[in-house]
Amino acid sequence: MKTIAFDVMGNDFGPQAAVQASLEFVQKNPDFQIILVGDKKEIEKFTKETSQIKILESPNIASSKDGLRQVSKMENSMNSALDLVVEKKADAVLSSGDSGAYLTSALLKVKRLKGILRPAFMPIFPTIVKDKKILVLDVGANLETKVEYLIQWTKLASIFSNKILKVKNPKCALVNIGVEDYKGFDFHKQANEELKQSNANYIGFLEPRNILDGKVDVAVVDGYGGNLILKSMEGAVLALKKVIKESITKTFFRKILALFLKKAFKDAAERLDYRNVGAAWVLGLNGIVVKSHGSNDFKAYLGALEQVKQGINAKVIDVFRETLE
């Protein structure tokens, strides 16, 4: 039985959506069990223990307000979930708690893969090409970025794209303000030259507006810029949905026309719905550590659990270790 440790505390809406997604997930995946970590009384409002659902009492919520170093030593649901992976009682951990606390605790407990300098947050974005995904990293784990980080992230993400997303010889690019070699900061230019000489299928710089074109499989970016890209994309998709809804309900004729276009609108919204992904990998650690959004709903949590399942089934950490040796 494969096991996922799921910290269901610290999100925006309580444990209900996380628990319900877990129940749906184990029903579809009889070879998996989930350990729900959190306030047992709250969790038991929505489920009892079963052969596939276990509950670990750990009601305290991790917060970076307590100090990042200090929070990693405290008793909270996040640390309890991470400890299950460290103690080999779980194959992976998922949490939607405080990002800073999660990254720090995971670094101190799970540790980095041998030779990896810094982990990165890596979501899997949908693109405008049907069934085509792109890996984008780092989206906020590191405010300062060195050339070596970008090189290592490119290598790890290429392996991930190949083994998890089944992309043959993934195309990689560095996100920059332009595609010309002379543009960007010094670390952009140096990393660009080094990646040209590497074994990666590197195509050069990529502008942010082209990330969702579907022509690239891996987009590597500094953590500050990546976080801006992530939040801008989420906001743009939500704004677009709102504008379309307002526009098609303005007149009676548009409402009638919208009925005929309903399936097309639904397909487009589904293709760009980030909830189908639901999470970002903490890439570069010596274990499967996945971070979901604090505002996740049922659908987003289900997408996150599916991501974790893919990583476990592909034995992605073993693949990383073998490749990095």
UniProtKB/Swiss-Prot annotation:
Keyword Protease in annotation: no
Keywords: Cytoplasm, Lipid biosynthesis, Lipid metabolism, Phospholipid biosynthesis, Phospholipid metabolism, Transferase
Subcellular localization: Cytoplasm
Keyword tRNA-binding annotated: no
GO cellular-component term (any): cytoplasm
Reactions performed catalytically: a fatty acyl-[ACP] + phosphate = an acyl phosphate + holo-[ACP]
GO molecular function: phosphate:acyl-[acyl carrier protein] acyltransferase activity
Single GO biological process annotation from the record: phospholipid biosynthetic process
Annotated metabolic or biological route of this protein: Lipid metabolism; phospholipid metabolism
EC number: 2.3.1.274
Top-rank EC class of the record's enzyme: transferase
Primary residence: cytoplasm
SUPFAM superfamilies (alphabetical): Isocitrate/Isopropylmalate dehydrogenase-like
Domain of life: Bacteria
Function statement: Catalyzes the reversible formation of acyl-phosphate (acyl-PO(4)) from acyl-[acyl-carrier-protein] (acyl-ACP). This enzyme utilizes acyl-ACP as fatty acyl donor, but not acyl-CoA.
Complexes and interactors: Homodimer. Probably interacts with PlsY.
Xref: PANTHER family: FATTY ACID/PHOSPHOLIPID SYNTHESIS PROTEIN PLSX (PTHR30100), PHOSPHATE ACYLTRANSFERASE (PTHR30100:SF1)
UniProt similarity note: Belongs to the PlsX family.
Name of this protein: Phosphate acyltransferase
Record gene name: plsX
